[in-house]
Amino acid sequence: AAEVAPCELTVAPSGLSFCDKVVGTGPQAVKGQLIKAHYVGRLEN
């Protein structure tokens, strides 16, 4: 089963902030590979 991790924000060079709430146990994605993700977008104001 996946493990729930504390949410520490990572900021990408583009300014996008993200965190991994659940870290899976499968193989890591590589650049160019199609992935499936669930996300929540929020605005500052």
UniProtKB/Swiss-Prot annotation:
It is an enzyme of class 5 (isomerase). GO terms for molecular function: peptidyl-prolyl cis-trans isomerase activity. Its EC number is 5.2.1.8. Keywords: Chloroplast, Isomerase, Plastid, Rotamase, Thylakoid. One of its GO terms (cellular component) is chloroplast thylakoid lumen. PANTHER family: PEPTIDYLPROLYL ISOMERASE (PTHR47833:SF2), PHOTOSYNTHETIC NDH SUBUNIT OF LUMENAL LOCATION 4, CHLOROPLASTIC (PTHR47833). The keyword Plastid applies. Belongs to the FKBP-type PPIase family. This is FKBP-type peptidyl-prolyl cis-trans isomerase, chloroplastic. It catalyses: [protein]-peptidylproline (omega=180) = [protein]-peptidylproline (omega=0). Expressed in leaves, but not in roots. It is found in: Plastid, Chloroplast thylakoid lumen. PPIases accelerate the folding of proteins. It catalyzes the cis-trans isomerization of proline imidic peptide bonds in oligopeptides.
